[in-house]
Protein backbone atom coordinates (compact mmCIF):
# COMPACT_ATOMS: atom_id res chain seq x y z
CA UNK A 1 0.00 0.00 0.00
CA UNK A 2 2.86 2.36 0.85
CA UNK A 3 4.56 1.66 -2.49
CA UNK A 4 1.36 2.49 -4.39
CA UNK A 5 0.99 5.78 -2.51
CA UNK A 6 4.60 6.68 -3.25
CA UNK A 7 4.07 6.02 -6.96
CA UNK A 8 0.93 8.15 -7.07
CA UNK A 9 2.71 11.01 -5.32
CA UNK A 10 5.55 10.65 -7.80
CA UNK A 11 3.11 10.95 -10.69
CA UNK A 12 1.40 14.00 -9.25
CA UNK A 13 4.80 15.61 -8.84
CA UNK A 14 5.67 14.85 -12.46
CA UNK A 15 2.51 16.57 -13.63
CA UNK A 16 3.32 19.67 -11.59
CA UNK A 17 6.90 19.54 -12.86
CA UNK A 18 5.67 19.92 -16.41
CA UNK A 19 3.60 22.90 -15.33
CA UNK A 20 6.72 24.55 -13.93
CA UNK A 21 8.62 23.90 -17.17
CA UNK A 22 5.86 25.53 -19.22
CA UNK A 23 5.40 28.44 -16.82
CA UNK A 24 9.16 28.92 -16.81
CA UNK A 25 9.04 29.21 -20.58
CA UNK A 26 6.28 31.83 -20.42
CA UNK A 27 7.97 33.78 -17.63
CA UNK A 28 11.19 33.90 -19.61
CA UNK A 29 9.77 36.68 -21.73
CA UNK A 30 9.43 39.10 -18.82
CA UNK A 31 11.80 42.03 -18.48
CA UNK A 32 14.15 41.53 -15.56
CA UNK A 33 16.50 44.52 -15.67
CA UNK A 34 15.15 45.77 -12.35
CA UNK A 35 16.45 42.60 -10.66
CA UNK A 36 20.05 43.08 -11.71
CA UNK A 37 22.58 42.92 -8.87
CA UNK A 38 26.36 43.01 -8.95
CA UNK A 39 27.66 40.16 -6.81
CA UNK A 40 31.27 39.75 -5.65
CA UNK A 41 32.82 36.31 -5.37
CA UNK A 42 32.87 34.98 -1.83
CA UNK A 43 35.59 32.46 -2.57
CA UNK A 44 38.72 34.60 -2.80
CA UNK A 45 39.94 38.03 -1.88
CA UNK A 46 42.54 37.88 -4.60
CA UNK A 47 41.75 39.59 -7.88
CA UNK A 48 44.65 38.00 -9.74
CA UNK A 49 42.51 35.20 -11.17
CA UNK A 50 39.10 36.84 -11.26
CA UNK A 51 36.69 37.38 -14.12
CA UNK A 52 33.37 39.16 -14.31
CA UNK A 53 30.53 37.16 -15.85
CA UNK A 54 27.58 39.08 -17.22
CA UNK A 55 24.35 37.13 -16.97
CA UNK A 56 20.66 37.97 -17.32
CA UNK A 57 20.23 39.08 -13.72
CA UNK A 58 23.46 40.90 -13.03
CA UNK A 59 27.25 40.91 -13.13
CA UNK A 60 29.08 38.38 -10.98
CA UNK A 61 32.77 38.28 -10.10
CA UNK A 62 34.23 34.80 -9.90
CA UNK A 63 37.73 34.18 -8.59
CA UNK A 64 39.81 31.02 -8.68
CA UNK A 65 38.45 27.82 -10.22
CA UNK A 66 35.00 26.68 -9.00
CA UNK A 67 35.12 23.01 -8.04
CA UNK A 68 31.75 22.45 -6.41
CA UNK A 69 28.97 23.55 -8.79
CA UNK A 70 25.23 23.29 -8.27
CA UNK A 71 22.52 23.72 -10.91
CA UNK A 72 18.92 24.72 -10.28
CA UNK A 73 17.14 23.62 -13.48
CA UNK A 74 17.14 20.94 -16.21
CA UNK A 75 18.42 23.56 -18.68
CA UNK A 76 21.49 24.41 -16.62
CA UNK A 77 22.08 20.73 -15.86
CA UNK A 78 22.11 20.08 -19.61
CA UNK A 79 24.70 22.84 -20.10
CA UNK A 80 26.90 21.68 -17.22
CA UNK A 81 26.93 18.08 -18.44
CA UNK A 82 27.71 19.34 -21.95
CA UNK A 83 30.84 20.97 -20.52
CA UNK A 84 31.84 17.51 -19.23
CA UNK A 85 31.27 18.53 -15.61
CA UNK A 86 29.13 16.96 -12.91
CA UNK A 87 26.78 18.65 -10.42
CA UNK A 88 27.38 18.65 -6.67
CA UNK A 89 23.73 19.57 -6.18
CA UNK A 90 20.60 19.74 -8.30
CA UNK A 91 17.20 21.40 -7.99
CA UNK A 92 14.45 20.13 -10.29
CA UNK A 93 11.39 22.11 -11.42
CA UNK A 94 9.64 20.09 -8.72
CA UNK A 95 10.79 17.18 -6.61
CA UNK A 96 10.12 13.78 -8.14
CA UNK A 97 12.46 12.43 -5.51
CA UNK A 98 12.48 13.66 -1.93
CA UNK A 99 15.51 12.07 -0.31
CA UNK A 100 18.57 14.12 0.59
CA UNK A 101 20.63 12.80 -2.32
CA UNK A 102 19.93 11.60 -5.84
CA UNK A 103 21.36 8.15 -5.13
CA UNK A 104 20.32 6.75 -8.52
CA UNK A 105 20.04 9.71 -10.93
CA UNK A 106 19.08 7.50 -13.87
CA UNK A 107 15.82 6.67 -12.06
CA UNK A 108 15.28 10.08 -10.49
CA UNK A 109 16.17 12.72 -13.09
CA UNK A 110 14.23 12.43 -16.37
CA UNK A 111 16.23 12.23 -19.61
CA UNK A 112 19.51 13.62 -18.22
CA UNK A 113 19.94 11.22 -15.30
CA UNK A 114 21.87 8.62 -17.28
CA UNK A 115 24.70 11.13 -17.75
CA UNK A 116 24.94 12.11 -14.09
CA UNK A 117 27.74 10.10 -12.48
CA UNK A 118 27.72 11.87 -9.11
CA UNK A 119 25.10 11.58 -6.39
CA UNK A 120 24.03 15.23 -6.23
CA UNK A 121 22.49 16.74 -3.13
CA UNK A 122 18.75 17.22 -3.66
CA UNK A 123 18.26 20.98 -3.38
CA UNK A 124 14.50 20.93 -3.71
CA UNK A 125 13.01 22.99 -6.54
CA UNK A 126 14.47 25.75 -8.65
CA UNK A 127 11.67 28.11 -7.68
CA UNK A 128 12.21 27.40 -3.98
CA UNK A 129 15.66 25.89 -3.41
CA UNK A 130 16.63 24.51 -0.03
CA UNK A 131 18.79 27.27 1.44
CA UNK A 132 19.69 25.03 4.36
CA UNK A 133 21.12 22.30 2.14
CA UNK A 134 22.78 24.85 -0.13
CA UNK A 135 24.51 26.51 2.80
CA UNK A 136 25.66 23.15 4.18
CA UNK A 137 26.97 22.10 0.76
CA UNK A 138 29.11 25.27 0.46
CA UNK A 139 29.17 25.42 -3.34
CA UNK A 140 31.72 27.45 -5.26
CA UNK A 141 29.17 28.41 -7.92
CA UNK A 142 25.39 28.37 -8.32
CA UNK A 143 23.85 28.26 -11.80
CA UNK A 144 20.13 28.55 -12.49
CA UNK A 145 17.52 30.18 -14.65
CA UNK A 146 14.57 32.54 -14.33
CA UNK A 147 12.68 30.21 -12.02
CA UNK A 148 15.14 31.04 -9.23
CA UNK A 149 15.17 34.81 -9.72
CA UNK A 150 13.22 35.57 -6.53
CA UNK A 151 16.09 34.01 -4.56
CA UNK A 152 18.92 35.66 -6.47
CA UNK A 153 20.08 38.02 -3.72
CA UNK A 154 19.93 35.23 -1.12
CA UNK A 155 21.73 32.73 -3.34
CA UNK A 156 24.43 35.30 -4.07
CA UNK A 157 25.25 35.47 -0.37
CA UNK A 158 25.87 31.71 -0.35
CA UNK A 159 28.05 31.60 -3.48
CA UNK A 160 28.59 33.48 -6.75
CA UNK A 161 25.37 33.01 -8.70
CA UNK A 162 24.60 33.08 -12.43
CA UNK A 163 20.98 33.09 -13.62
CA UNK A 164 19.73 32.89 -17.19
CA UNK A 165 16.50 34.01 -18.83
CA UNK A 166 14.70 33.18 -22.11
CA UNK A 167 15.99 29.59 -22.34
CA UNK A 168 13.58 28.76 -25.21
CA UNK A 169 14.76 31.62 -27.42
CA UNK A 170 16.77 30.85 -30.56
CA UNK A 171 20.52 30.99 -29.92
CA UNK A 172 20.11 31.39 -26.18
CA UNK A 173 21.70 28.16 -25.00
CA UNK A 174 24.79 28.87 -27.11
CA UNK A 175 25.14 32.24 -25.39
CA UNK A 176 24.57 30.75 -21.95
CA UNK A 177 27.01 27.88 -22.29
CA UNK A 178 29.82 30.17 -23.40
CA UNK A 179 29.37 32.43 -20.37
CA UNK A 180 29.12 29.49 -18.00
CA UNK A 181 32.24 28.04 -19.62
CA UNK A 182 34.10 31.29 -18.99
CA UNK A 183 33.16 31.07 -15.31
CA UNK A 184 34.40 27.47 -15.15
CA UNK A 185 37.43 27.68 -17.41
CA UNK A 186 35.81 25.37 -19.98
CA UNK A 187 35.75 27.59 -23.07
CA UNK A 188 37.13 24.84 -25.30
CA UNK A 189 34.43 22.40 -24.21
CA UNK A 190 31.73 25.00 -24.85
CA UNK A 191 32.94 25.61 -28.37
CA UNK A 192 33.12 21.87 -28.94
CA UNK A 193 29.49 21.50 -27.81
CA UNK A 194 28.42 24.24 -30.24
CA UNK A 195 30.48 22.73 -33.07
CA UNK A 196 29.02 19.27 -32.41
CA UNK A 197 25.52 20.77 -32.45
CA UNK A 198 26.12 22.37 -35.84
CA UNK A 199 27.58 19.14 -37.22
CA UNK A 200 24.59 17.19 -35.93
CA UNK A 201 22.16 19.63 -37.53
CA UNK A 202 24.03 19.38 -40.85
CA UNK A 203 24.15 15.57 -40.73
CA UNK A 204 20.46 15.32 -39.88
CA UNK A 205 19.62 17.71 -42.71
CA UNK A 206 21.27 15.29 -45.14
CA UNK A 207 19.72 12.23 -43.50
CA UNK A 208 16.17 13.64 -43.58
CA UNK A 209 16.48 15.38 -46.96
CA UNK A 210 14.31 12.82 -48.83
CA UNK A 211 11.55 13.10 -46.22
CA UNK A 212 11.69 16.89 -46.11
CA UNK A 213 11.63 17.14 -49.90
CA UNK A 214 8.28 15.34 -49.87
CA UNK A 215 6.90 16.86 -46.67
CA UNK A 216 8.65 20.20 -46.06
CA UNK A 217 6.07 22.01 -43.91
CA UNK A 218 6.11 21.20 -40.20
CA UNK A 219 3.77 22.41 -37.45
CA UNK A 220 4.79 22.02 -33.79
CA UNK A 221 2.18 22.44 -31.07
CA UNK A 222 2.16 22.22 -27.29
CA UNK A 223 -1.01 21.18 -25.45
CA UNK A 224 -2.56 19.11 -22.70
CA UNK A 225 -6.02 18.27 -24.03
CA UNK A 226 -6.67 20.83 -26.82
CA UNK A 227 -9.44 22.56 -24.90
CA UNK A 228 -7.87 25.15 -22.60
CA UNK A 229 -4.18 25.17 -23.48
CA UNK A 230 -2.74 24.99 -26.97
CA UNK A 231 0.28 26.87 -28.28
CA UNK A 232 2.23 27.07 -31.51
CA UNK A 233 6.03 27.03 -31.63
CA UNK A 234 7.40 30.23 -33.14
CA UNK A 235 10.14 29.92 -35.79
CA UNK A 236 12.21 32.32 -33.63
CA UNK A 237 12.76 29.75 -30.89
CA UNK A 238 15.05 26.97 -29.72
CA UNK A 239 12.95 24.37 -31.54
CA UNK A 240 12.50 26.61 -34.56
CA UNK A 241 16.27 26.95 -34.85
CA UNK A 242 16.73 23.16 -34.76
CA UNK A 243 13.93 22.26 -37.15
CA UNK A 244 14.62 25.02 -39.67
CA UNK A 245 18.31 24.17 -39.52
CA UNK A 246 17.43 20.61 -40.47
CA UNK A 247 15.51 21.93 -43.46
CA UNK A 248 11.86 22.15 -42.45
CA UNK A 249 9.70 25.16 -43.10
CA UNK A 250 7.99 25.84 -39.78
CA UNK A 251 4.29 26.58 -40.20
CA UNK A 252 2.89 29.57 -38.33
CA UNK A 253 0.20 32.23 -38.72
CA UNK A 254 0.87 35.39 -40.75
CA UNK A 255 -0.46 37.43 -37.84
CA UNK A 256 2.31 36.03 -35.63
CA UNK A 257 5.13 37.02 -37.97
CA UNK A 258 6.36 39.84 -35.73
CA UNK A 259 5.68 38.07 -32.44
CA UNK A 260 8.96 37.33 -30.69
CA UNK A 261 7.59 34.91 -28.08
CA UNK A 262 8.97 31.37 -28.57
CA UNK A 263 5.59 29.80 -27.73
CA UNK A 264 2.34 31.55 -28.69
CA UNK A 265 -1.14 30.60 -27.39
CA UNK A 266 -3.81 29.89 -30.00
CA UNK A 267 -7.29 28.38 -29.98
CA UNK A 268 -8.38 25.01 -31.35
CA UNK A 269 -10.50 26.89 -33.90
CA UNK A 270 -7.28 28.31 -35.39
CA UNK A 271 -5.97 24.92 -36.51
CA UNK A 272 -7.67 24.91 -39.95
CA UNK A 273 -5.64 28.04 -40.80
CA UNK A 274 -2.53 25.89 -40.31
CA UNK A 275 -3.69 23.08 -42.57
CA UNK A 276 -0.79 23.58 -44.98
CA UNK A 277 1.36 21.54 -42.57
CA UNK A 278 2.49 18.23 -44.06
CA UNK A 279 3.53 16.93 -40.65
CA UNK A 280 2.46 17.86 -37.12
CA UNK A 281 4.31 17.20 -33.88
CA UNK A 282 2.27 17.62 -30.70
CA UNK A 283 4.24 18.18 -27.50
CA UNK A 284 1.96 16.85 -24.80
CA UNK A 285 1.92 17.55 -21.11
CA UNK A 286 -0.27 16.06 -18.43
CA UNK A 287 -1.45 18.26 -15.57
CA UNK A 288 -3.41 15.42 -13.95
CA UNK A 289 -1.96 12.15 -12.79
CA UNK A 290 -2.86 9.08 -14.83
CA UNK A 291 -1.06 5.78 -15.04
CA UNK A 292 1.65 5.17 -12.46
CA UNK A 293 5.28 5.44 -13.37
CA UNK A 294 6.99 2.10 -13.31
CA UNK A 295 10.36 1.44 -11.74
CA UNK A 296 13.04 -0.39 -13.67
CA UNK A 297 15.59 0.46 -16.32
CA UNK A 298 16.00 4.09 -17.30
CA UNK A 299 14.66 3.35 -20.76
CA UNK A 300 11.41 2.17 -19.19
CA UNK A 301 11.44 5.13 -16.76
CA UNK A 302 11.63 7.63 -19.62
CA UNK A 303 9.10 5.68 -21.69
CA UNK A 304 6.61 5.80 -18.84
CA UNK A 305 7.12 9.55 -18.54
CA UNK A 306 6.49 9.97 -22.26
CA UNK A 307 3.37 7.83 -22.20
CA UNK A 308 1.95 9.63 -19.19
CA UNK A 309 2.71 13.13 -20.41
CA UNK A 310 1.57 12.71 -24.01
CA UNK A 311 -1.52 10.56 -23.47
CA UNK A 312 -4.08 13.35 -22.76
CA UNK A 313 -3.09 15.25 -25.92
CA UNK A 314 -3.12 12.05 -27.95
CA UNK A 315 -6.59 11.07 -26.76
CA UNK A 316 -7.95 14.57 -27.27
CA UNK A 317 -6.53 14.75 -30.80
CA UNK A 318 -8.22 11.49 -31.80
CA UNK A 319 -11.59 12.68 -30.53
CA UNK A 320 -11.49 16.26 -31.82
CA UNK A 321 -13.24 16.83 -35.14
CA UNK A 322 -11.17 19.90 -36.02
CA UNK A 323 -7.89 18.09 -35.36
CA UNK A 324 -9.03 15.07 -37.36
CA UNK A 325 -10.03 17.27 -40.31
CA UNK A 326 -6.43 18.36 -40.90
CA UNK A 327 -4.55 16.87 -43.83
CA UNK A 328 -1.71 15.63 -41.62
CA UNK A 329 -4.21 13.69 -39.50
CA UNK A 330 -5.81 12.11 -42.54
CA UNK A 331 -2.38 11.05 -43.82
CA UNK A 332 -1.34 9.66 -40.41
CA UNK A 333 1.48 12.19 -40.07
CA UNK A 334 0.76 13.48 -36.57
CA UNK A 335 3.33 12.47 -33.95
CA UNK A 336 3.17 12.84 -30.18
CA UNK A 337 6.14 13.80 -28.01
CA UNK A 338 6.51 15.38 -24.57
CA UNK A 339 7.00 19.04 -23.78
CA UNK A 340 9.61 18.07 -21.19
CA UNK A 341 11.86 16.34 -23.73
CA UNK A 342 11.34 18.76 -26.61
CA UNK A 343 11.21 22.13 -24.87
CA UNK A 344 12.22 21.60 -21.25
CA UNK A 345 15.97 20.98 -21.57
CA UNK A 346 16.98 23.47 -24.26
CA UNK A 347 20.64 22.54 -24.59
CA UNK A 348 23.02 20.28 -26.55
CA UNK A 349 21.79 17.08 -24.89
CA UNK A 350 18.18 18.16 -25.28
CA UNK A 351 18.84 18.75 -28.97
CA UNK A 352 20.23 15.23 -29.35
CA UNK A 353 17.07 13.84 -27.74
CA UNK A 354 14.83 15.88 -30.06
CA UNK A 355 16.71 14.75 -33.16
CA UNK A 356 16.77 11.15 -31.96
CA UNK A 357 13.00 11.10 -31.65
CA UNK A 358 12.51 12.99 -34.90
CA UNK A 359 14.43 10.22 -36.66
CA UNK A 360 12.21 7.63 -35.00
CA UNK A 361 9.10 9.46 -36.18
CA UNK A 362 10.15 10.05 -39.77
CA UNK A 363 12.54 7.24 -40.68
CA UNK A 364 11.31 4.17 -38.83
CA UNK A 365 9.03 1.99 -40.93
CA UNK A 366 7.68 0.52 -37.71
CA UNK A 367 6.77 3.86 -36.13
CA UNK A 368 3.26 3.81 -34.74
CA UNK A 369 1.86 7.29 -34.32
CA UNK A 370 -0.05 6.10 -31.28
CA UNK A 371 3.22 5.62 -29.41
CA UNK A 372 5.45 8.53 -28.33
Positions of the model-derived regions?
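Bacterial N-terminal signal peptides that target proteins for export
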Residues: 2-12
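C-terminal motif of bacterial Sec signal peptides marking the signal peptidase cleavage site
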Residues: 21-24
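Bacterial signal peptide processing site
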Residues: 26-29
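Basic- and aromatic-lined ligand-binding clefts that recognize polyanionic substrates
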Residues: 70-71, 76-80, 192-253, 261
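A short, structured surface patch at a secondary-structure boundary
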Residues: 77-130
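Proline-aspartate-enriched helix->loop->beta-strand connector
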Residues: 131-143, 160, 271, 276-281
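Extracytoplasmic substrate-binding proteins
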Residues: 151-154, 159-228, 333, 340-372
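Structured C-terminal subdomain patch of bacterial secreted/periplasmic proteins
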Residues: 284-372
